[in-house]
Amino acid sequence: MAMNINEIHALMDGLPIGAWVAISTDQRRVLSYGEDALQVFAEAKKQGEKVPFIGRVPDPNELMFF
Amino acid sequence: MRRITYPYSKIGIDNQARHRPMADVILIASNGESVRFEALADTGADFCLFPLNVAKLLGLRLDQLETATTTGVGNASNLTYCDDLTIDLGDGIIFTTRVGFTWGMDRAGFGLLGQQGFFENYNVEFRHRDRIFAIESA
């Protein structure tokens, strides 16, 4: 089942821009956040999440081009 | 036929908001490790590309991966590590393809679903005015 990215981003509100964040699969909880992606991932796994969602808090003022 | 419809992600507020065709994907490495991540459906990307940190989360050893150089806006040459991964979008849409990992994507914090593996295998409908897009298997 696909997760709703906007609901995931809503959970990131108030967290530091650019921080790595782990979100629970049920899209209800921030499991961990910080500057180190590996540490954030490890802390989420410690909480029993087998496949946590990992992302970064987006910067609303940043324009992106690829 | 399988079809998944997603709302565009919305970053920012009001008329300053950016709307992007983002999907959540599960990346599965050959070692069995997996991580859930967000990825932009990007017709301009030649292949699927993710932040280098994702390779580390998956436990991939960079010194054992093939390397290539990739080019994007602002960066003429990015060292990119490559491996074959399975990408699962859910609802039966799943494929295995060569994926690149580069530091250039770490700032973005999401990946790109590109031509190879993704657009070549699925019909993708963008309805930008409605802020939705759909991925459809044959």
Can you annotate each of these PLM segments?
Chain B
Residues 1-138:
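Pepsin/retropepsin-fold aspartyl endopeptidases
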